[in-house]
């Protein structure tokens, strides 16, 4: 989604005044004035959400639904379209995906109440209950269960301070971090917000930083640090914010802007988020958008999850676990102690195989407590969410008790903290609530509380009595049907119900006379094939049934509200338990993956070493295994930023298709996995943490920004040379290939020298400029490795093995031949190459080549009569005599030619 096109509705739209409008249209226009100008208004009318005026025009086009007219206003026809309320979420999902925002105007009373309040012409009261935006979704039908849905706010103060605050409304997660200007793109790419709030003056810049996010510009006043601090204190009911962190002014501004926007989206209700967690600057490995895309961490270049690194290692069994794993890959750590804590948790589950399998079986039953809790807190939850919470916390307690029974060893920090969050023995109120939810809610409750029928029998005596009265009345209806049928002698008589007539007697048209003459039956409706009647008894019975049903439903809704309030009181403990379950899922799943893929625990340090023995590319290895194309060839990689244990800059040469790019990417992914706190696909690994990861591998035109492929490549290279530090890790592939040979070689040469002397970082530099390999002789911390190939019976065989030293050939012409270049072109290329290699000076050699000397196409080979006859012979079908005759015949043919 392009950011500049994510405002499909202008922010300066205007609508007609309500003067002269009908009462209903007057109400619509009043609500329309309250809603954000850049949002569509879904106006509830019975079983439909209707849209009017410009909203209808835009929505009908986006949803491909009919656009009609509904009367006139101020002399102009009123455009209208609508969607059924029962399927509204599907339409909402399409609008949100297209970048729209939608204000929802709900009916706040039923028509009966409206009539009782203001007579037959009274308009049902309506109010905007929420504004649905890409970053404020909570419904399962609108979200991918395995993907976080974040909304972020970027605050940039005039002092130069900047900060990002972000939240996932669907889980309650809320964080903030200071951010340096040069890291903005990397930070935004890491969180991948569905929606980004920015100050109006920074909209254009933000559009470049977050091309896939919906941008929401806000007035400067929304980013005021002082008012934000007051808002934060009120929101979390504290006197000082130091309990949550020592926030900078920029952090306060970002937090406040985000809270204010979320409150507006809830029609003024406060956001239901956990207290903000502060993330220190530099706490995560910085990965810029280009690097993130080229390494295909969470999505491939085509946008698919399949084929990404996340897809290759994900063995999680819960949606919260999948989201947490994706977050870890998106934001690897730089703190060795925190990385080791994650690795300790994986190691613990790696050793406890039986317990791990039992845990994973239990987790499959746990559901998504994080999102269920958030929906309940926001007033969007239902009975199923209550049941889901109870099930998750019950499973959590069982998991905790079983893991605590382990006698293998003491659990590491992350595991012990999770066990503490799941054990209910020291949380009596939460334990009591879970037990109450289990008793109160039926096994398969409805989605919405208003549907009723979710409170279990025996939980509330008065509710049971009302249900019995309601059900008994329904049995009386069945008895009345039989009585009426016998009284009038019409066995086909039926008692039915609809929302217009209530209960009524229905007979076919030919039996109508039998009831018309009976005073008990009051004629109500004649249809083509049936006649309908009512009776005094049915009317009285319906009133009793309706009264009992209404009272029972009201009692259930009250019970739901009470249980929801109790859940809200325990929200912090429930969140802690839900996070623990997700933590266990990630650790156990990574242990499972490590076992399946023979991954090793990396040894982490603060130095600058990068020693990999038998490293493999996790995605390519998995693809080979699935396709049955053999085993991946492992390779070592040794780098040292200090240049002591190994070279810090290594040139990688070798034939096309030999695996240079794969080798580069696999080492970048190994570093990233290690810093994410995962085992790595290698026999052994010793890794010093990096502060930034850069990948200049592959490029494409960026026509929207007026950039050619070469320009895009140079911009990425410039960013690396300007920003990489001695602690960074860089992979570069074919720098300078998009321009003239000498220009490209010169650029690549200068970039290599700069990486070595100025940046001083660990770097892998793949190139076909063999002249570059001479730098290893001149630069003290530069070296050469190459991908090996062998010629066998005229064919080139790629070994995919990395060895020391530089390659002497690229075999590009051989690869071109394999790709299907015409033979004449291949031969011409071979001739040109031979001349160039012999003369050693490309410009001079080319001028000496006879133009088009070999460009005349060779004649197609003529197949002789002998060859044709030989092709027709089946030697196994010939007798010795027949074979001899054929031989004489072939010899005779040769004499003719």
Curated annotation (Swiss-Prot):
It holds the Pfam family MutS_V. Keywords: ATP-binding, DNA damage, DNA repair, DNA-binding, Nucleotide-binding. One of its GO terms (molecular function) is ATP-dependent DNA damage sensor activity. The keyword Nucleotide-binding applies. SUPFAM superfamilies: DNA repair protein MutS, domain I, DNA repair protein MutS, domain II, DNA repair protein MutS, domain III, P-loop containing nucleoside triphosphate hydrolases. GO terms for biological process: mismatch repair. One of its GO terms (cellular component) is cytosol. ATP binds at residues 654-661. PROSITE patterns: DNA_MISMATCH_REPAIR_2. Belongs to the DNA mismatch repair MutS family. This protein is involved in the repair of mismatches in DNA. It is possible that it carries out the mismatch recognition step. This protein has a weak ATPase activity. This is DNA mismatch repair protein MutS.
